[in-house]
Amino acid sequence: MLYKGDTLYLDWLEDGIAELVFDTPGSVNKLDTATVASLGEAIGVLEQQSDLKGLLLRSNKAAFIVGADITEFLSLFLVPEEQLSQWLHFANSVFNRLEDLPVPTIAAVNGYALGGGCECVLATDYRLATPDLRIGLPETKLGIMPGFGGSVRMPRMLGADSALEIIAAGKDVGADQALKIGLVDGVVKAEKLVEGAIAILRQAINGDLDWKAKRQPKLEPLKLSKIEAAMSFTIAKGMVAQTAGKHYPAPITAVKTIEAAARFGREEALNLENKSFVPLAHTNEARALVGIFLNDQYVKGKAKKLTKDVETPKQAAVLGAGIMGGGIAYQSAWKGVPVVMKDINDKSLTLGMTEAAKLLNKQLERGKIDGLKLAGVISTIHPTLDYAGFDRVDVVVEAVVENPKVKKAVLAETEQKVRPDTVLASNTSTIPISELANALERPENFCGMHFFNPVHRMPLVEIIRGEKSSDETIAKVVAWASKMGKTPIVVNDCPGFFVNRVLFPYFAGFSQLLRDGAGFRKIDKVMEKQFGWPMGPAYLLDVVGIDTAHHAQAVMAAGFPQRMQKDYRDAIDALFDANRFGQKNGLGFWRYKEDSKGKPKKEEDVVVDDLLAKVSQPKRDFSEEEIIARMMIPMVNEVVRCLEEGIIATPAEADMALVYGLGFPPFHGGAFRWLDTLGSAKYLDMAQQYQHLGPLYEVPEGLRNKARHNEPYYPPVEPARPVGDLKTA
């Protein structure tokens, strides 16, 4: 053994060839600060070996290196700029020394090589991969850019266009694509990986492969003519500006850095990467996006722990076909759980099956499946007008009309047709689960399962625990949602549960702004362009359905009369009374016509202004700051109340539900991350300016306490002390 660290070791393999093996305790290899330091020590040992002829890098895990240790990021981002820059210089000196070894090097890459893992293998001369490879640089999705030389080496290896596509979009690619663009040199079966890598090393050692020529382009300026450079970088900057926008600075910074570094050799190019990385790491956007990643891991880990002792349902059923039922049936069948889809009429069943077939055909068009797979999946969805097969199902989700009487009748009837241990769930969006449970003989086997539309796209499923729902019931439904590829978040029961309960105060803020003379077009523009929502409130209401919102608004008002009961006729009432229900009937705040792809496209409709004038004060101008404050304060206050009342368990789960269920702007990180970034004292000052607008603007006592003591909702993070000898940087 030449060297043994906590996460890697170095040993002779054969005949002057050494192997450096990543072997972190636990299930995956991560390139954390300690591993980078350990890698530097191992390379120091290699530099002393006079009889070294070649080096093989490999992993003892199912994946090569999944990336940097993102749990370190938040504390690393608090390190002062100069110190963080120094540490990056140190880390890059380690990869440079790997790249500069006086012998050929190869990485045998299996499974994932992402982020720092990808940057590590870019420093070797050759890369041999297995068919399950996923390799790429996802850093821009976390609000940063590659910091271990990825923005320098990848463009010089692949050419500017291919590298920009991966780096700016935070993409990863599979084995075939990696081979095609030159990111790996070969693909072999897993059992041949080490043998194949040694064979390539031997060819390089014997002079059959010119490893020095392979290495040289990575040390030099990027070989691009002025015209080629202008075309590549201008197109890339235009596309990034269009897709990422001003709220996500990392992609455009990465492109500009690669452009600026193109004319320099490795050392100066790495200095430019360093100078760009450090300011990005100190942005609120980076902290928010890393926070989302960590919250996502927390939520998924919680679901895994919750379901460890239950069996995932093997057969499911959906009550109520149509678009929603068809979407749920498709998602279940697509992920391998056969489903019976029941309705009371053929027309709805046909609609449900058509929806499932349409979604599968899209997968076929994209080349994700072939005709055989399509037929196989669709054959596991069984449409029926009766309860045939219900005695075999493990879980049933009801997705009928949002009417408590109808839902109770359907659930009570279904309970008599299934096994005593079958779990029932309701896909209600607002009706309390404990109220629906009153119709059942086995309320302990019942809970809520709130999907979001469109089911195949929206990652969140709210799992609602009723007063009598058993732990096993919750666990089984969480297991099914996870199997469907969804992110399940368990919430306690109340009108609207969590997501809709906090959404309707936001809509109330919108209604009050309209009542006071604000224009809906400006509100939408501000909430989309300035705050960052994917849709403004008017457009969102059109998509949700004005009739749906009108009904839900009444349910929420009955549930929370003190805050949500309004004493005036609002815009939602005016449009509802005029039979303007949004996209579903082509008339809402906008008029809708189908484009060439059959998607609804919004157009101006002056009739709306006349309708709104009847429920509004004369038009007046509002600042962007006031619009954002008046829209967001009611929502954030309600989010805080939900945490204080135990409707949602943690800030992490609340923020993920908002991001995954409502599209809360990821660069803000969710309501609690936004609160922490703003500071609760500053938020309190802002909210107090609008207290005269009513109870929705009154800040909950718990948040007032946070403001008094300057306490954040997320645990405070201490700056990291990166491992590594900064003197060698």
Swiss-Prot record:
Residues 1-189 are annotated as: Enoyl-CoA hydratase/isomerase. The keyword Cytoplasm does not apply. Residues 708-729 are annotated as: Disordered. The active site is at H450. Its EC number is 4.2.1.17, 5.1.2.3, 5.3.3.8, 1.1.1.35. It catalyses: a (3S)-3-hydroxyacyl-CoA + NAD(+) = a 3-oxoacyl-CoA + NADH + H(+); a (3S)-3-hydroxyacyl-CoA = a (2E)-enoyl-CoA + H2O; a 4-saturated-(3S)-3-hydroxyacyl-CoA = a (3E)-enoyl-CoA + H2O; (3S)-3-hydroxybutanoyl-CoA = (3R)-3-hydroxybutanoyl-CoA. In the N-terminal section; belongs to the enoyl-CoA hydratase/isomerase family. In the C-terminal section; belongs to the 3-hydroxyacyl-CoA dehydrogenase family. Involved in the aerobic and anaerobic degradation of long-chain fatty acids via beta-oxidation cycle. Catalyzes the formation of 3-oxoacyl-CoA from enoyl-CoA via L-3-hydroxyacyl-CoA. It can also use D-3-hydroxyacyl-CoA and cis-3-enoyl-CoA as substrate. This is Fatty acid oxidation complex subunit alpha. It comes from Escherichia coli O45:K1 (strain S88 / ExPEC).
